[in-house]
């Protein structure tokens, strides 16, 4: 496939299970090499300039890798530190990410105690934590309740005004 997404655009990959949506997302995030050709994010090749490309990406994989023995806040602090965010900036960004995904009542909760929907929100919070230019969301509403689906769709619309956003789904209304 060949495509370009401009800043501020929202692009969705729609298709049945096994159609290559997740594979495409993994190629774009640098987790898988393309079988032919190249993939680039913000002008950086995802294979040869992987770290530079990843600095511009917020990624929510279909199955969010979470440290369930951490609280939501500690998890975000840990990931922000790994990303090299300055301590004074990190506190503000954690507060903002938690507010955006409506996790305020759960910031001190252990991830192991959260429902699937709130774990998904935690994953989304880590994806937006560093204010990336490009958000890549793989099946962002899978397995969450109908109210959270509506809230997540609304947040995606808001984020799409600010960032380039790619998402995958096999649900047509998405």
Which residues does each predicted region cover?
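Helical segment within the ABC ATPase nucleotide-binding domain
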Residues: 149-162
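Conserved ABC transporter NBD signature motif
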Residues: 37-48, 52-53
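A short, proline-enriched helix->beta-strand linker immediately N-terminal to the Walker B motif
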Residues: 129-133, 162
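Hydrophobic anchor residue at the start of the ABC signature
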Residues: 124
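Catalytic Walker B motif of ABC-type/P-loop ATPase nucleotide-binding domains
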Residues: 135-139, 144
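Conserved ABC ATPase "signature" region
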Residues: 77, 81, 88-106
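Helix-to-loop junction immediately C-terminal to a conserved catalytic motif
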Residues: 29
């Amino acid at each position: 496939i060949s495509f370009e997404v401009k800043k501020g655009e929202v692009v969705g990959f729609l298709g049945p299970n096994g159609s290559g949506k997740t594979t495409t997302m993994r190629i774009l995030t640098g987790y898988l090499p393309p079988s032919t050709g190249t993939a680039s994010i913000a002008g950086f090749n995802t294979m040869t300039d992987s770290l530079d490309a990843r600095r511009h990406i917020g990624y929510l994989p279909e199955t969010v890798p979470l440290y369930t023995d951490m609280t939501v806040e500690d998890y975000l602090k840990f990931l922000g530190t790994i990303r090299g965010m300055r301590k004074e900036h990190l506190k503000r960004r954690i507060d903002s990410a938690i507010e955006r995904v409506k996790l305020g009542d759960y910031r001190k909760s252990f991830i192991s105690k959260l429902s699937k929907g709130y774990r998904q929100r935690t994953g989304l919070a880590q994806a937006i934590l560093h204010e990336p230019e490009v958000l890549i969301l793989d099946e962002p509403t899978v397995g969450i309740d109908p109210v959270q689906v509506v809230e997540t769709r609304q947040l995606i619309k808001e984020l799409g005004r600010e960032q380039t956003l790619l998402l995958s789904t096999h649900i047509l209304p998405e």
